[in-house]
Amino acid sequence: MKFGRSLGILLRVSIKYPKFRLEFMKIVFIQPKGRGKFSICPEPPLGLAYLAASLLRYRTDLEIEIIDGFLLDNDKYMEVISNLEADIIGVTSTMSQLDEALRIPSLIKNKNTKFILGGPGVTNLPSSKFYESGYSVICYGEGEKTIVELTEAFENKLALKDVNGISFLLNSNEIRTPPRELIENLNDIPLPARELLDMKKYVSIWKEKMGFPCSQMVSSRGCPFSCRFCDKSIFGKKVRFMSPSRIIEEMKLLYNTYNVEMIYFEDELFTINKKRVLDFCDTIEKELPGKKWGANGRVETVDFEMLSKMKQAGCVEINFGVESGSQKILDFLGKGIMVEQIKKAFKWVNEVGINGGMYLIIGVPGETQMDIDMTKELIRESEPKIINLFYLTPFPGTKIFELTKHLIRNDVDFYNYNDEFESVYRKDVFEVEPKQRLKEVTDFFLETFKGRVDPRLSIGDGTALKD
């Protein structure tokens, strides 16, 4: 299973924002309830915590609250949302949360509340439905600067057209402002306001499900590669890094304040820069000896030296986007890697003693039994300790959507997407239903490594082996 995703929010930086001038405001950020693995083992909504921290840096009289629907049962969630009183409510949404996100404005009694919607679920869908649901502003791209400017604009009745990275209605016409530039220096972003999150609950859930307390953080943003199923509209293709000292500062907070035993880096590609990884490992060995951590990698960006150094510095897990053991499928997905590179990476991972994980995609149009057999053979030969299985989902805005949208079922509505565990393609696209393929690969993994599967780590779509 992929592990993953402080008070020090007054970090001094060079960004200058306009000063706020008017009276007290209450701002509530919401992560809606959703479906899928994160409802089973939720991760802190760090994106919302970054937004809160960006506001709190410049103003201490704001009342800010973060609500995570994943931590609440249905009745409690409805009670909390329907009784909210706030000047601004900001909602983040993935595609699987979007139907719930669209419902939130109708549940709020205060008709003067301004509603803001952002996140990966909203970027590439027509926005008319968002406005119809009650949202005043739609945000695109990184939001740390945008939320500060939007709050000032709402409070001081300034023109929204001067805030980059948003869209809104003016006289029934949509206005979309210029894109928000990426934040070049990630050290300029304050540490996420975890003090507004129920970190004790997140950590305790991970301890219960995984057997040890774990939490998540990021040390970079962006990915330069062009996988056809991936959307880079939020963080872009340019990779930007936090400094080693900034990373260590946040790690120490997690280890010391929240008593975690492991930190997982949710970076899209932790291993993109070898020198940075080696320097980071040197810093870890000096500042945090003996601490455990994990990360995501890409098979052609690692080598034996890097992995050995990572192991020496406390890395216990690395997950790779393998997707398939079939070169045909890899090429169709635009992965830009070779099967032999996958095998070599796992050979090194196993030699140095890091738990290696595979993200695998099932249900690719054109997938045959031979492709599935190749994936099973890759699993057998590579001996991953963890597998995470996903159906290929052609989300709007991705290249794979443009290539395969004519194969999507007529009943699929991405505004009401709840098929995270069901293929969105028509059944006639496949020789065998993807659900059966997924079971076949899972059963193969369990049977091949019988006796080594750790039931605590068989969560959602993830299955892992005992050490």
Language model feature labels by segment:
Residues 37-48:
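Glycine- and acidic-residue-enriched helix-capping/strand-helix junction motifs
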Residues 25, 35, 163, 169-219:
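N-terminal [4Fe-4S]-dependent radical SAM core
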